[in-house]
Curated annotation (Swiss-Prot):
Biological process annotations from GO: photosynthesis, light reaction
Enzyme Commission identifier(s): 7.1.1.-
Chain segments annotated as transmembrane: 7-27, 64-84, 89-109
GO CC term (a single one): plasma membrane-derived thylakoid membrane
HAMAP family, A to Z: NDH1_NuoA
Subunit structure: NDH-1 can be composed of about 15 different subunits; different subcomplexes with different compositions have been identified which probably have different functions.
Membrane topology: Multi-pass membrane protein
Entry keywords, A to Z: Membrane, NAD, NADP, Plastoquinone, Quinone, Thylakoid, Translocase, Transmembrane, Transmembrane helix, Transport
Keyword set includes ATP-binding: no
Protein's UniProt name: NAD(P)H-quinone oxidoreductase subunit 3
Highest taxon in the source lineage: Bacteria
Catalytic activity: a plastoquinone + NADH + (n+1) H(+)(in) = a plastoquinol + NAD(+) + n H(+)(out); a plastoquinone + NADPH + (n+1) H(+)(in) = a plastoquinol + NADP(+) + n H(+)(out)
Role description: NDH-1 shuttles electrons from an unknown electron donor, via FMN and iron-sulfur (Fe-S) centers, to quinones in the respiratory and/or the photosynthetic chain. The immediate electron acceptor for the enzyme in this species is believed to be plastoquinone. Couples the redox reaction to proton translocation, and thus conserves the redox energy in a proton gradient. Cyanobacterial NDH-1 also plays a role in inorganic carbon-concentration.
Length: 120
């Protein structure tokens, strides 16, 4: 047998990571109960009969607020570890964080001027 310099472990893990979901999905498909009537395909809403259609159109403002929220939520996720380790990182990390915050402030000003934060 020849030596792959440790790549056989990576290949083994890749194979295992590929086989486990395939086996789990196959087992669930084999073991699940089949059949069921038309009631099984209806929407369940707190035990009440659904009223109206499921295809309603949401206002685009909800999506704009959600996108702005996600952007600044990700900003918080990136800035929190930096703030925790601030005393050990030094001046270069401080300057990098300031550049990151400046880019996000520019994005906030852009969204504000485009009217993404207004509900009217």
């Amino acid at each position: 047998m020849f030596v792959l310099n440790g790549y056989e472990y990576v290949l083994g893990f890749l194979l295992a990571c590929s086989l486990i979901p395939i086996l789990a999905l196959t087992a669930s498909k084999i073991l699940r109960p089949s059949g069921g009537g038309p009631e099984r395909r209806t929407t369940y809403e707190s035990g009440m009969e659904p009223i109206g259609g499921a295809w309603i159109q949401f206002n685009i403002r909800y999506y704009m607020f959600a996108l702005v929220f996600v952007v600044f939520d990700v900003e918080t996720v990136f800035l929190y570890p930096w703030a925790v380790a601030f005393s050990r990182l030094g001046l270069l990390a401080f300057v990098e964080a300031l550049i990151f915050i400046a880019i996000l402030v520019v994005a906030l000003v852009y969204a504000w001027r485009k009217g993404a934060l207004e509900w009217s």
